[in-house]
């Protein structure tokens, strides 16, 4: 059975698990390395276990392992570790490393599903999972619709990552579990708001900021800080929680704002995604909402094209220039 797309996808072996971002500070690289090793320790035996049951399960399981070990910023494990240390916890404790691995698996779940919802063609410079499996379906002449098959497989792979994320926190205390559960709800609620905003044309800046905070900002920094602190000392977390939020929420907002700029202006070699992807998808970002609020009539006509999947590169460049001219980037 030919498996061209899957066979040629890059893999990570046990000897190449070091964090790939050389520019990252040493403290972040140490955290990333510990989490990568832990992910490999968990996922490789699981891959072999299920492949022994049925060889057809090897590739789906390998997709989870490939994505979580293919790079990424590792910010969530880092902030979880730093929150743990902030209340006196050991930054090298097994529970906080497991929590970091849980965050990476949860993020993988979100990426698998997000790529399906956005119909994204690439992720981190590689074809997205649903496109690879859809192409495989077509090449092998299987019954049914190739696109729906690819999307279905990607959704199920994402669901598996979600389950493995929960398993990593099996030994967490009750306070930490409450935070983890709230994080999962917030992430999914934010994604619902994002989808609705993409089709309804969100123009209100406050609404766009709320979407971004719940889709990404809270679960990137604030909640990892909370979870790390609660894992170290639930009682001290009750005192430190508001302090961590006062730091984490605005920083999370800033992170998402930068991500929005990259989504609108970043090149594919930097982002690993097509140029202008957020503009073609009509993402309800604060950046776009600010541009629309400040746009002249002529600029508004250009910005009205946001959300068209068939935008040419020239039209994307025109929209980018209109955003700059409105002062939304200032």
Question: Where are each of the predicted segments found?
Answer:
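All-alpha prenyltransferase/terpene-synthase fold signal
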Residues: 1-330
């Amino acid at each position: 059975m030919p498996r061209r797309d899957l066979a040629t996808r890059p893999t990570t072996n046990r000897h190449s698990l070091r964090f790939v971002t050389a520019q990252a500070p040493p403290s972040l690289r140490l955290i990333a390395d510990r989490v990568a090793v832990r992910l490999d320790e968990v996922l490789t035996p699981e891959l072999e276990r299920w492949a022994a049951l049925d060889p057809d399960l090897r590739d789906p399981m390998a997709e989870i392992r490939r994505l979580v070990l293919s790079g990424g910023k590792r910010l969530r494990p880092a902030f979880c570790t730093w929150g743990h240390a902030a209340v006196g916890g050991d930054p090298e404790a097994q529970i906080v490393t497991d929590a970091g691995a849980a965050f990476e698996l949860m993020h993988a779940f979100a990426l698998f599903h997000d790529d399906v919802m956005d119909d994204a063609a690439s992720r981190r410079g590689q074809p997205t999972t649903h496109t690879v499996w859809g192409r495989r379906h077509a090449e092998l002449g299987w019954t049914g619709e190739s696109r729906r098959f690819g999307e279905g497989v990607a959704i199920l792979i994402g669901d598996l990552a979600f389950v493995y994320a929960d398993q990593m926190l099996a030994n967490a205390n009750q306070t930490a579990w409450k935070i983890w559960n709230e994080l999962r709800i917030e992430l999914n609620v934010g994604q619902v708001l994002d989808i609705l905003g993409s089709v309804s044309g969100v123009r209100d800046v406050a609404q766009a900021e709320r979407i971004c905070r719940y889709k990404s900002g809270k679960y990137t920094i604030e909640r990892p800080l909370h979870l790390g602190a609660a894992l170290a000392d639930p009682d001290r977390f009750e005192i430190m929680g508001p302090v961590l939020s006062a730091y984490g929420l605005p920083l999370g907002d800033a992170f998402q704002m930068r991500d929005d700029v990259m989504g609108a202006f970043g090149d594919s070699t930097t982002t690993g995604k097509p140029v202008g992807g957020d503009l073609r998808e009509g993402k309800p970002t604060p950046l776009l909402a600010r541009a629309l609020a400040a746009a002249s009539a002529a600029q508004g006509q250009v910005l009205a094209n946001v959300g068209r999947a068939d935008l040419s590169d020239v039209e994307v460049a025109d929209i980018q220039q209109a955003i700059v001219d409105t002062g939304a980037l200032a």
